[in-house]
Amino acid sequence: FEGKYPEAEPAARLLVKQFPEYGDARVLLGRIIAWQGRYDEAAAVIDTLLSSEPDNSDALSALADIRRWSHDRSRQVTAPTDIRAGYMFDTFSEPYERFWQVFTLGAGHRFSWGTAVAAVNYGHINTGPPSGTSDGDFQFAAEAWPELTRKNYAYVSYAYSNGPWFPRHRAALELWQTLPAGLAVSAGVNYYYFDHNIFIGTVSLEKYLAKYWFSGRAYFHFKDIGVTTSFFLNARRYLGTADYVQLTLGTGTAPDEPYDIITDLERQKASSVRLTWFNQINQWWSFRIGAGYSYEKYSATSNRNRFEGNIGIIRGIGRAK
């Protein structure tokens, strides 16, 4: 079309009207609309086709491209540099009361190769009898999401703490491969060191479908006695270009998240549910809030309820590109 998408769109619409059962025509129309930056409208055109042909590979591939372009556009209209602050808590009351909080302050920047973030975390723990502990700990962390190719990207992170509660060292590496039909797969490993080495591997399968993103993820905790596992399902509903709500369900014996604190080593098995809401208010401000509940085993014969919550704010700096 040599970039003449406004002229090509009426012709594509006429083709769809004359041949409504011709799937390639709807795919073409959806792509032409997306190339003009109208991603929600383009996704709706493809959704119409998928409602009658849910396995149409061309439509699924087009929808994945539209979602990716929409995400790229949302990054372009936000400031490339930001400062960010966050807070989280995690608490239980058996076999003793424990209230763990983490306050975070950091900064991020979007480079040509991807995004990087550096942060300082301050953790504070309060426990009830018999120990009656009230103590704090600092952690210094850095993470990045480099884009290796158009089909591959990665996540790398490292954190260090010299205190008694956070792991001394925490590192992670995960690689993603995008596939046709809106699919992606990943594999990675998380490493922690308290007074011994801990390795947790992870694999995932992801799927974009219209305004939804689904993910199945497994974790493998490598121990001297063997390998323990856990499994998690994520369902995300996009409310706009970047806004979403996400539900996470999980069960198993391997932690699904970093060991934030040494007392997490008590966990033996858990089932959990989490809900997260992310809102990009404008090019300068974005906001995230989440809550979760776990029913976990901490000894051979004892279980407990566990509650968590988190909130984060990001303030952009500089001009959007």
Tell where the protein language model's regions lie, with residue ranges.
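Register position in tetratricopeptide repeats
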Residues: 1-2, 18, 35-36, 52, ...
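Canonical positions in the second alpha-helix
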Residues: 14-15, 48-49
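Transmembrane beta-strand segments of Gram-negative outer membrane beta-barrel proteins
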Residues: 73-91, 109-118, 154
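Outer-membrane beta-barrel translocator/channel fold
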Residues: 90-101, 120-140, 157-182, 186-308
